[in-house]
Amino acid sequence: MTKSYMPLFRSPRQFKKIYFILIPLILAVIILHVFFDGFNKISEYSPTFISNRILNHQDQQQKSEKSSDVISSYFPSLAIYPKNFDNRVEFVNEPKNSKWIQYFGDSKTVLSNYITNQTYTNHSIGLYSSSTVRPPASSCKDILYERSFEITKYRTLHDDLYKLATTLLYQLENDPAFQDLSPFFNDRLPHIIMRGELHKHIYKFAGTSVWLEQHGVHLMLSRVIYSQQGKKNDPQLSLLYAQVYDENWNELNDIELIVPVINPNGERVYDSVKYPQFLAIPFYHNSEYIKSRWYGPEDTRLILTKNKFGDDEPVIIFNSYHRQIKDMSTEDDNNVHTKFEFYRSMFVGWLFQYQLGKLNTDGIQDSKFNNVTFNKVKELRIEGKERTSIEKNWTPFIDPDERNQISYYGNHNLGDNYVYIVYQWNHLKILKCELDNFIDSSHSTCTMFFKDVETTQEVGPVRGGTELWPIKIDNNNNNNNLNEDDLSTKQEPQQQRQLWIGFLRAHVKDCGCGGSMYRPNFLILEKLNSKFKLTYLSGSINFNVSVYGWANYDVVCAGHEANALIPNGISMFDQDDDYLTLSMSVADQDNTLVHIHGVKKLIYSLDHDWNGILKENKQIECVVNNANDFCKAYADEHYKLGDSEAAIKEVKQKAKEEAEKAKAEKEKAEKEKAEKEKAEKEKEEKEKEEKEEKEKAEKEKEEKEKAEKELAEKELAEQKDEDAKDEDKNEDEDDKEKNDESGLTEKSEVEENGENTNEGGEDDGDGDGEEEKEDDDDIEV
């Protein structure tokens, strides 16, 4: 059964009304697209790219419900061609995404309305000068300049750990450069993903980025560490994760950049590179030995250079654990025995240049990597110096005065041939390292280009930090401040002074907050002829960023942990409008951005009158003192807020003491109650016993009295009986005596009257017998 047809417009009038709305809307979108959108379809750039695929895409766009929303239609799957795309260059891997566009925006695109329209607040900093023109400073206050710039509220970039983990899992299974890393994960990664425990094993931080002007995007590299045991301070593997962001710092997922790369043969070709992805940085590793070994690139700094073809070349400076051959010997069994030494050394790497194998990191070439493509890296070796066990915290920068104009088709090698590196900030030491035309192809040779004074002092607490960004200012040094002793070093006036700005990190230990503290320090480095000077260095800056605990998010200044806010890179610096974006990390666990307005204004507000003379100064000492004071103040503040370990311990101790006190009081009360109850019970029992005893005694008394009474009565009765008996006896005796007396009388009478008695014997005898019988009866009774 078919449905009846229902027309879209029921009348021509409705059709016209719709057109009156649609036509202006479409025209407005086209105008906005042309004037404000830096992206255009690649088919509009070159007719050679008009293909069935592009036409199909355009056909689909015409049918799409979002055909008027041109910008959003580019995403999520997209391939971006550079605005200087050269179709004469060979293409090795064409993009897999169905949507192709080319970027035509200008260099100002990096400063978007998103950045300029944010709310900025004043932020004060103190800078310590190393000026030798001013009178010798007796205290830190004498060289302190109070200045300020404006900052936005910090923004923490979202970490999609699921996307990161699935990308890693795909590369472990499919990318030859990563397959050998699989044993580190022991097939646990899928289970970790399923259980939702990625945050326990994977940490992403130390993000640093560059703006790719030819593509109109930020390319950010972050360090990703993996811990088998789920402990952030005990990782086994460190990798580099590359992501692409637009000018508003929105991540562009599953995007391809068409970039000019230099293949292992040294040829310039176009390649399609998909992001996000983990970079195939070669490094030595052994999954069977993981104790006290952290494999992979660390402390990566990203800097944009120009290669010999004139292309923007993202270059990384990092340190990595590697091995090198120390000794090789042949034993009696004719087997070659190799002894290795292990180092943590500095390397330079190229994001768009490649190599086969990893001989330069493993010490020997393993045949299984012979045909595996890695990013090109070279160890940075200081000329005339043996390798040390650990090298780290180098600060890179490019000198634009040495950057020549590029002429690729003229076959000129005129790119950035060198990168400068600040090797040490206290007693300044600067290296100059090769980026091309290597003296020794196995490494990049670094020469000690400048050193303040000869010293064996180790790297101090001020170190590392971001890459340095060049800036030129008008010269205000007229040499009027030179004294007679300095005439021999008098310099000719320059039209402009070459400066570099950046952010170091002061690392102070045992300062009152946990084990140590890291905070950014703004710096200004100056070059005069071939001499360098750290002219200004600020005290610790917090940028109003909340620094949470290293292990426990809610507890700061804990144990031996670091309280860390570390500057990673300058993402952009628009000098015309004076905006700068700084990337930082908190507690080695995230990437945070702060936009700054007024850095250039701050620089121009300072004196720049260095005449090339180098003298001792208190600058570094003052900065370190400031860092220690900052640390103590921070610890005191968070002690008052109650989220420091000391405050929490005190609260817990007080709570424990109060609990113990309450327990003791409770026990005391219970004891007193028990004792009272016991006493009352004992009293009751005693009273009861006394009562019972009393009653018993009374009863016994009564019974005794009764018995005594009865006994007395009995005795009385008996006495009475006895008395009666005695009385009777006495009476009987009296009677007897009487009788005896009567008898004697009678006898005498008889004797006297013997004859009378004998004559009347029967009658008298009978009578006398009856009287005796009666007497006997009376006695018996």
UniProtKB/Swiss-Prot annotation:
Transmembrane segments annotated in the record for this chain: 18-38
GO biological process: cell wall organization
Highest taxon in the source lineage: Eukaryota
Gene Ontology terms for molecular function: mannosyltransferase activity
Observed phenotype of the null mutant: Impairs the elongation of beta-mannose chains on the acid-labile fraction of cell wall phosphopeptidomannan.
KW Metal-binding (keyword) present: no
Residues in compartment: Cytoplasmic: 1-17
Coiled-coil stretches noted in the UniProt entry, renumbered to this chain: 640-733
Compositionally skewed regions (Basic and acidic residues) per UniProt: 663-728, 736-750
Composition bias type Acidic residues, residue spans: 751-781
EC class name: transferase
Protein topology in the membrane: Single-pass type II membrane protein
A GO cellular component annotation in the UniProt record: membrane
The keyword Translocase belongs to this UniProt entry's keyword annotation: no
InterPro entries named among the record's database cross-references: BMT1
Annotated keywords: Cell wall biogenesis/degradation, Coiled coil, Glycosyltransferase, Membrane, Signal-anchor, Transferase, Transmembrane, Transmembrane helix
EC number(s) stated in the UniProt entry for this protein: 2.4.1.-
Stretches for region Disordered: 663-781
Subcellular location: Membrane
Induction, as annotated: Expression in regulated by TSA1 and repressed in rat catheter biofilm.
Topological region Extracellular: 39-781
Function: Beta-mannosyltransferase involved in cell wall biosynthesis. Required for the elongation of beta-mannose chains on the acid-labile fraction of cell wall phosphopeptidomannan.
Family: Belongs to the BMT family.
Protein name per Swiss-Prot or TrEMBL: Beta-mannosyltransferase 4
Organism: Candida albicans (strain SC5314 / ATCC MYA-2876) (Yeast)
